Amino acid sequence: MVLTILFSAYKLCRFFAMSSPRPGAERLAVPGPDGGGGAGPWWTAGGRGPREVSPGVGAEVQGALERALPELQQALSALKQAGGGRAVGAGLAEVFQLVEEAWLLPAMGREVAQGLCDAIRLEGGLDLLLRLLQAPELETRVQAARLLEQILVAENRRDRVARIGLGVILNLAKEREPVELARSVAGILEHMFKHSEETCQRLVAAGGLDAVLYWCRRTDPALLRHCALALANCAMHGGQAAQRRMVEKRAAEWLFPLAFSKEDELLRLHACLAVAVLATNKEVEREVERSGTLALVEPLVASLDPGRFARCLVDASDTSQGRGPDDLQRLVPLLDSSRMEAQCIGAFYLCAEAVIMHIKNRNKVFSDIGAIQSLKRLVSYSTNGTTSALAKRALRLLGEEVPRPILPCVASWKEAEVQTWLQQIGFSQYCESFREQQVDGDLLLRLTEEELQTDLGMKSGITRKRFFRELTELKTFANYATCDRSNLADWLGSLDPRFRQYTYGLVSCGLDRSLLHRVSEQQLLEDCGIRLGVHRVRILTAAREMLHSPLPCTGSKPSGDVPDVFISYRRNSGSQLASLLKVHLQLHGFSVFIDVEKLEAGKFEDKLIQSIMSARNFVLVLSAGALDKCMQDHDCKDWVHKEIVTALSCGKNIVPVIDGFEWPEPHTLPEDMQAVLTFNGIKWSHEYQEATIEKIIRFLQGRSSRDSSAGSDTSLEGAAPMGPT
């Protein structure tokens, strides 16, 4: 009776949800004998005999499968016997609808869909789909790819597709077009990158990564979302070798337009996840930083609500049940990373997943994967407000105790702060002995194992190891600004995040960065307490190498701060093109400045003006309505207006790039910017991006866009200027 009510209620909800048009709804309609829709979802059908299912499933899941499996078997049988393209298409659509609606079932959707996916594999459906993916008819390949994307659960990835289907998928990826096929193939690659490290590396080596990076320049939202998730999965599951190949193929740069999107928050978050994972690899961290994509992570996360993000995931069929334990486990190392961006995006995703798991009463999974302690560590030690707030929210949703934040200036702690810290790390039984010995922050940071055993009564060697593990973490996250004048802590952290633990021992001996190269290894051991010989060697080697290179903290201005190109754009219509231009120009060796909304309040205008003045070239993105706000702006308050006027007054090489823009009459613009209409514009082509970029580069390399001969090039990109007449 309860199951009947559940299914009836779900049918009623879907009726009201489908009574108004929604994107993609029409693809779920299955033609019936009269050409109309089918008889309705399988869970509302009655009169079917029971079918045996796995004995371990719950009663509700078993009931749903008993209704669905006969209908699925019938649809698969009809698909196998289909003779023509129309019949094959109808069969694929019917199976697709059954699986799609299973994923959308509330609470038990993952289990029911898993059962259907297993049945398709056992009935030979995977082999059939792999054959249909090689069919000559494009529509058949599109529908088969769409269905395969829906059923690539772990067992199906492992059983057949990874063993015999990678070649078929890679051949489809080489087609690149049309977008309907690319969308599903990107989704398939998204799933297959999760299969194993070996499979991931095979896909990277055989062209799968190249296809995903190529599609990053497209504009289809669903395709771009698959690309972002595919790159995130490749980074998380492919190991360091795959991460190196991703950076070599400039994946960090191609993630920029995805993370810079103004229309799709899910897309931006998945792209930020991908670049944050890449940045945790110390071998490629610097290259990832230079891409500029990493700077987008924290501002984006700070602007979003994980609860709303969780609702978006629940509303999508492929994420409605939240991530599985294996996927969640991959997020935990982000929390333990030394990179703030990785901690921030990891805390956001786990907070959103905590919302979903809280609704579905599956909180235990967070304890199983070890996320609770990592979240508590962030609350205690993170100095980033966004990260700490997200970790607190996740812990509350999971019903866990939220620890108090640790004051970062540990050296200044009084005895009371030491007592609080002992209680938080689970060493309350030693509070009395620490109190009797009057241990404050200074003594805590210089505590030795002998003192811990003899003076503080910690007899067990294992207990002392646990204590020093917590103390090392405290030393690593501590702020030494009050005693570390040469910023030794950050320099040590740049060698290895673990080396920050040695900061207080070094500065307590009166050492700074200018003296470190004069110290012997024995002095580091005996005076500074650095017990590990390998660490001593690495620190001394780096200190002596530092003599031959400028200090990172010196006041000299790095050349990377002087851009070759400044890109000006209108946010509401030109963001996507501006970000694409940035990537293309970076790949051709140009340094590019583009505002990423991370400038401090009050310094926004100064930073922009300085960047324009220092850049040789000024690329003006003229998207739809780009100059509308400039009209009647006689006080020059509009940012695009200010940027154009500054570029004109500084004599910059101005290169307008046109995309859906209509030139206004000169008299409608303020007089101080009318001269911009005399420059030759380059018409942007999404279909022929490389050709367009080549022309832009010719203008940037010394051929002024004011040169009238430039506009005479007979190419599809050229757009004549509209000067005053």
UniProtKB/Swiss-Prot annotation:
Cross-referenced SMART domains: SAM (SM00454), TIR (SM00255)
Region (Disordered): 705-725
Keywords: Cell projection, Cytoplasm, Differentiation, Hydrolase, Immunity, Innate immunity, Mitochondrion, NAD, Neurogenesis, Phosphoprotein, Repeat, Synapse, Transit peptide
Source superkingdom: Eukaryota
Upper taxonomic lineage: Eukaryota, Metazoa, Chordata, Craniata, Vertebrata
Active-site residues, as the UniProt record annotates them: E643
Protein name: NAD(+) hydrolase SARM1
Entry's EC annotation: 3.2.2.6, 3.2.2.-
